[in-house]
Swiss-Prot record, chain B:
<feature type="binding site">
    <location>
        <begin position="27"/>
        <end position="28"/>
    </location>
    <ligand>
        <name>substrate</name>
    </ligand>
</feature>
<dbReference type="InterPro" id="IPR016181">
    <property type="entry name" value="Acyl_CoA_acyltransferase"/>
</dbReference>
<comment type="function">
    <text>Catalyzes the N-acetylation of the amino acid thialysine (S-(2-aminoethyl)-L-cysteine), a L-lysine analog with the 4-methylene group substituted with a sulfur. May also catalyze acetylation of polyamines, such as norspermidine, spermidine or spermine. However, ability to acetylate polyamines is weak, suggesting that it does not act as a diamine acetyltransferase in vivo.</text>
</comment>
<keyword id="KW-0012">Acyltransferase</keyword>
<protein>
    <recommendedName>
        <fullName>Thialysine N-epsilon-acetyltransferase</fullName>
        <ecNumber>2.3.1.-</ecNumber>
        <ecNumber>2.3.1.57</ecNumber>
    </recommendedName>
</protein>
<feature type="domain" description="N-acetyltransferase">
    <location>
        <begin position="4"/>
        <end position="166"/>
    </location>
</feature>
<feature type="binding site">
    <location>
        <begin position="133"/>
        <end position="135"/>
    </location>
    <ligand>
        <name>acetyl-CoA</name>
    </ligand>
</feature>
<feature type="binding site">
    <location>
        <position position="140"/>
    </location>
    <ligand>
        <name>acetyl-CoA</name>
    </ligand>
</feature>
<feature type="binding site">
    <location>
        <position position="92"/>
    </location>
    <ligand>
        <name>substrate</name>
    </ligand>
</feature>
<feature type="active site" description="Proton donor">
    <location>
        <position position="140"/>
    </location>
</feature>
<comment type="subunit">
    <text>Homodimer.</text>
</comment>
<keyword id="KW-0963">Cytoplasm</keyword>
<feature type="binding site">
    <location>
        <begin position="102"/>
        <end position="107"/>
    </location>
    <ligand>
        <name>acetyl-CoA</name>
    </ligand>
</feature>
<dbReference type="InterPro" id="IPR051016">
    <property type="entry name" value="Diverse_Substrate_AcTransf"/>
</dbReference>
<feature type="binding site">
    <location>
        <begin position="94"/>
        <end position="96"/>
    </location>
    <ligand>
        <name>acetyl-CoA</name>
    </ligand>
</feature>
<dbReference type="GO" id="GO:0008080">
    <property type="term" value="F:N-acetyltransferase activity"/>
</dbReference>
<comment type="similarity">
    <text>Belongs to the acetyltransferase family.</text>
</comment>
Length: 147, 170
């Protein structure tokens, strides 16, 4: 696979106008496919090649946390330090916002999960036994409907 | 049986909530991890930008009894976001004092959170359970929840303290 030449990249906060691009990347991440064909390269234009979607959560034992919901770089642009730069910016945001840690979910068949542990992350599910549970809308309606 | 009411917590409940937070940590065998203060709970839950919301389960004493209402459980939650489904609610903590269990108070708290979720246009409620807490797992499964760690292999990872500062500094 020919890697596109990247002279420079920057990581910046998203704006409202980025939403169509963000949705596009979200779908890519969900599909985990190589979507190189869909990327329009121009010699002068800017291309959005990655996203990190986060919000603040709360742990009653330690306080505010930064939760990284989605983290993705288009496959053709990996290995260039873009993901690492995004993680660096996120950590800076977390520290500036008085967060004690960053949490993020990983599907354990994802090889990148091993990278995270090498960078110092802890797998809470393996270490402490936490399981993530989900109720969907139908179950919410069942629960709310019963009195 | 005493009447139990599930209501929104007020700032004045923070002392009681912290007491119950410590009890829950003790139950989860992780009590040395509780670092939070009552002051932080007040500021973070009842300041200009709330970082969490909380429901409390309150037992109302019968007429003639000397003691006032008593907080015997809580559910602490916040709003989150799924890039696939949109608005979510995350139930971070749910706890009922041991002597008040078996009366459906925990279920009442979860149902109230479900009502809030629907009211705010959320499509999912998520929560985490420790793998040895079979009683809690059984309750959530009976209410229709799916164990995503078991079914889909989702694990929760954390960067904390030194690891996070290193990431920020590089």
């Amino acid at each position: 696979m020919r890697q596109p030449s990247v002279t420079s990249f920057r990581v910046r906060p998203a704006e409202a106008g980025d939403c169509p691009e963000i949705l596009h990347l979200i779908k890519e991440l969900a599909a985990c496919e190589n979507m190189l064909d869909a990327v329009k390269l121009t010699s002068k234009g800017k291309v959005t090649v990655g996203l990190a979607m986060y919000y603040f959560t709360y742990d009653p034992w330690i306080g505010k946390l930064l939760y990284l919901e989605d983290f993705y770089v288009i496959q053709a642009y990996r290995g260039l330090g873009i993901g690492a730069e995004m993680l660096k910016r996120l950590s800076q945001i977390a520290i500036r916002s008085q967060c004690n840690c960053m949490h993020f979910p990983v599907v354990t068949w994802n090889q990148a999960s091993i990278d995270y542990t090498h960078r110092g992350a802890l797998d809470l599910s393996s270490e402490e036994g936490w399981h993530l549970f989900r109720f969907n809308r139908e179950e919410l309606m069942d629960m709310a409907g019963e009195k | 049986m005493a009447f139990v009411m599930i209501r929104e917590a007020k700032e004045g409940d923070c002392g009681n909530i912290l007491r119950l937070i410590r009890e829950l940590a003790e139950y989860e065998k992780l009590s040395d991890q509780v670092k939070i203060s009552e002051e932080a709970l007040r500021a973070d839950g009842f300041g200009e930008t709330p970082f969490y919301h909380c429901l409390v389960a309150e037992i109302l004493s019968a007429p003639g009894e000397p003691q006032g209402p008593c907080v015997v459980g809580y559910g602490l939650y916040y709003f989150s976001y799924s890039t696939w489904k949109g608005r979510n609610i995350y139930l971070e903590d749910i706890y009922v004092k041991p002597e008040y269990r078996g009366q459906g108070i925990g279920s009442k708290i979860i149902k109230k959170v479900a009502e809030v979720a629907l009211d705010k246009g959320c499509s999912q409620l998520r929560l985490a359970v420790l793998d040895w807490n079979k009683r809690a797992m059984d309750l959530y499964k009976a209410l229709g929840a799916q164990d995503l760690t078991e079914a889909e292999g989702w694990h929760c990872f954390r960067f904390e303290g030194e690891a996070m500062r290193e990431l920020a500094g590089k």
